Amino acid sequence: MKFSHALLLASSLAFFACGGDDDDSPTGANSRYDCSVTGGVKVVYPTISEQFKIGQEITVVFGTDIEDNGYKIVFKKNASDMGVDLLEEAYDAVMDGKTCNEVKVKLDAKRGVEPTLTGIIRVAPYNKQNKGNNSELFIVKE
């Protein structure tokens, strides 16, 4: 009887130790985020009050149902900033209105990313900019 209790305890501890929920990246975005959207773009990551550093690579997660030839990922230092494109070329997204697209981008000072308390990622169809959408506000430090 004691052996079975010890075995049960050990297996429970192993289950929790292998969880992976402590990871900061949005791995398995379809299961962690609701990317469902109708008639536009929905940016689900980064979320509000996230903190990043200049030079850090982050994963932008978004859903869309707007058919286009690609998507722009733009960093804005505040709501009124025009922003800087973080990609060399347009991103080819899955546009079914339910899939979470994950795009790795670098917050690179060489591209114009600056420290800010009001950073925004804007994801927009390349040819239909008015259908784009912004992330929540986040922080970028030196």
Where are these regions (language model features)?
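Sec-dependent signal peptide recognition
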Residues: 2-9
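C-terminal motif of bacterial Sec signal peptides marking the signal peptidase cleavage site
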Residues: 15-17
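Extended, solvent-exposed regions of the mature portions of secreted/cell-surface glycoproteins
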Residues: 21-142
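Residue-level signal for mature regions of secreted extracellular proteins and peptides
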Residues: 11-12, 28
